[in-house]
């Protein structure tokens, strides 16, 4: 715990970092906290995505309410922001230590409302890929019984579930994924699995360059 937040984080082999903040109503997560606790991410792209609850967001001179599957992409570290949950809430931060410093405006979006669904895996999987300057983040929804296999790629990939389960394998190792665990896939490792019905995220660094992952 830190500052009233229950924090879980994982740093991958190519510096990809996924952090889960489980925040109680009334507590605050802001840019000062992130800068002081994650100095290695200063001036680096950070994508925040809400998977539970509602946040009151203050950003620069504006204020808004953010709910489930709302996300904000802070391209660099110059923005100031404050996120206050109006109920017990969960928000993820995705970044990478080895990202180059970037510039640009922040992007607010909702994965389900604003990101077009794509058929990346043949009909049984709804994928919504967001292409950032340095990261790719994909929300996926897998139907029960869906089987898939990827022959591998150079990009680091961290996969985790919001709900459901999936029997997963990577580089010959097998594991059942649920909302409490995930997998970090190594370079060019063959990976795949069978869905028991699941929704979750794939984060990639560097970002995917294939057309199907583009905006």
Identify the meaning behind each predicted range.
Residues 30, 57, 74, 93, ...:
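Short hydrophobic/aromatic-rich beta-strand segments that constitute the beta-sheet cores
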Residues 62-63, 76-102, 187-212:
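Ligand-binding loop in jelly-roll beta-barrel domains
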Residues 37, 42-44, 51, 56-70, ...:
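Extended, compositionally biased flexible segments
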Residues 40-56, 141, 152-167:
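Short, conserved beta-strand element in jelly-roll/cupin
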Residues 1-31, 36-38, 67-68, 72, ...:
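A short, N-terminal "cap"/entry segment at the start of jelly-roll beta-barrel domains
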Residues 32-35, 39-41, 81, 151-153, ...:
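Histidine-centered active-site/metal-ligand motif
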């Amino acid at each position: 715990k830190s500052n009233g937040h229950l924090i879980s984080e994982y740093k991958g082999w190519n510096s990809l970092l996924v952090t889960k903040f489980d925040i109680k109503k009334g507590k605050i997560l802001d840019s000062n906290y992130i800068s002081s606790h994650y100095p290695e991410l200063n001036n680096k792209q950070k994508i925040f995505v809400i998977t539970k609850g509602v946040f009151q967001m203050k950003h620069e001179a504006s204020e808004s309410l953010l709910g489930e599957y709302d996300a904000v992409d802070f391209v660099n570290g110059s923005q100031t922001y404050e996120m206050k949950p109006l109920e017990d809430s969960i928000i993820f931060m995705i970044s990478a230590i080895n990202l180059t410093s970037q510039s640009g405006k922040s992007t607010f979006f909702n994965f389900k409302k604003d990101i077009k669904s794509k058929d990346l895996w043949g009909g049984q999987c709804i994928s919504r890929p967001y292409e950032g300057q340095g990261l790719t983040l994909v929300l996926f929804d897998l139907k029960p019984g869906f089987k898939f296999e990827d022959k591998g790629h150079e990009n680091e990939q961290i996969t985790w579930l919001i709900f459901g389960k999936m029997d997963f394998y990577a580089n010959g190792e097998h594991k059942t994924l649920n909302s409490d665990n995930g997998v970090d896939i190594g370079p060019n490792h063959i990976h795949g699995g069978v869905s028991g019905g699941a929704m979750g995220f794939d984060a990639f660094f560097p970002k995917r360059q294939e057309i199907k992952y583009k905006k």
